[in-house]
Amino acid sequence: MKNKNFLVTGGTGFIGAGICKMLLMLGHNVTILDNNSRGKISRILKIEKKIKFIKGDIRDKKKVFHSMKNIDAVIHLAYINGTKFFYQKPDLILDVAVKGLVNIFDGCIKYKIKELYLASSSEVYQTPVKIPTDESEPLKIPNIYNPRYSYG
């Protein structure tokens, strides 16, 4: 496999930091775009000399586009998670999710990036029959009138 230049949005988050470490172990180059509002720089201290870190908000189109120059693949993890935030800050949740994803899509088009990986959540399975749960488990649509689930 050819070494690639990856952009990981949300790369200082729990999952993002782990993915960045794995990509480096596989010989890839890693750029992280994160504003650290929920992530922690401490998660990437051991790899900070091997990565390029760009502090920025996923809603800032100029910052997103700057981070996507010379990138081969994007792993988009920059979302706000946690049930309490869906109730406390629903406008912010929606703003980050929608504007962030639109900026990523636009950047992929502008820079002709053909690989884009998006993350989801175990919430799409509600209460699964099998744990651990894999992608063969049927998705369950929750009550769409609950603000937490009404964004789709």
Regions found by a protein language model. Name each.
Residues M1-G152:
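N-terminal Rossmann-like NAD(P)+-binding domain of SDR-like oxidoreductases, especially those catalyzing
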